[in-house]
Amino acid sequence: LQFIPRKFDDALYIMYSSRTTGKPKCIVHGIGGTLLQHVKELGLHTNLTNHQNIFYFTTCGWMMWNWLVSSLFFGATITLYEGSPATPSLPEFFDIIDREEIDIFGTSPKFLKALEETGYDALNKFKSLKTILSTGAPLISEQYDFVYQKIKEDVQLSSICGGTDILGCFMLGNPVLPVKRGEIQCLGLAMD
């Protein structure tokens, strides 16, 4: 590999806003700011280290893909999945966590609801799993119950909230604070 020095504010990603306010708008994210934001969120708020495996189920078109790629800064392993999580079934898709020894799993409330509707119950099966991240919509209180009663009792469940406009999170988890049912744990550092 040949590394080419770049300026702090050189373009890293070009993202497009959703169509909620009209035509999509182009948003350019710089190298330095994006990397600092992601290192803060992944390292301090998510407790990611170089010995961990992170699997965020996302498409390349969602900003969570860019967020996941920044995990490589830590030397962490990223696990990727192509295809529908419902094929062959949601429970079988979820078995990737054990097979690949995933430490941090990222998903959405919609996925957790669909998994719950299958009658899923594998409490404490996942030995490596330390953190579940969820974004795309707020987690409701009952989804916290499902995770802690049917998936793993001692997992860090973090409902996170961010956006394409900042290519990061406004609110997210904190590995040193308790998880409270139905609540996002804290504002991101320096986000007040």
Regions found by a protein language model. Give the residues of each.
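Generic beta-strand/beta-sheet core signal
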Residues: 14, 27-30, 57-58, 63, ...
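Conserved pre-ATP/AMP-binding loop-to-beta segment of ANL
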Residues: 1-16, 23, 33, 47-53, ...
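Gly/Ser/Thr-rich phosphate-binding loop
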Residues: 76, 103-106, 116-181
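Flexible loop/turn segments at secondary-structure boundaries
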Residues: 20-24, 35-36, 61-65, 80, ...
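Structural core segment of the AMP-binding/adenylate-forming
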Residues: 1, 98-102, 106-109
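Short coil-to-beta-strand transition motifs
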Residues: 185-191
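Conserved AMP-binding/adenylation subdomain of ANL enzymes
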Residues: 35-53, 63-103, 118
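Conserved S/T- and glycine-rich ATP-binding loop of Class I adenylate-forming
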Residues: 11, 17-20, 42, 54, ...
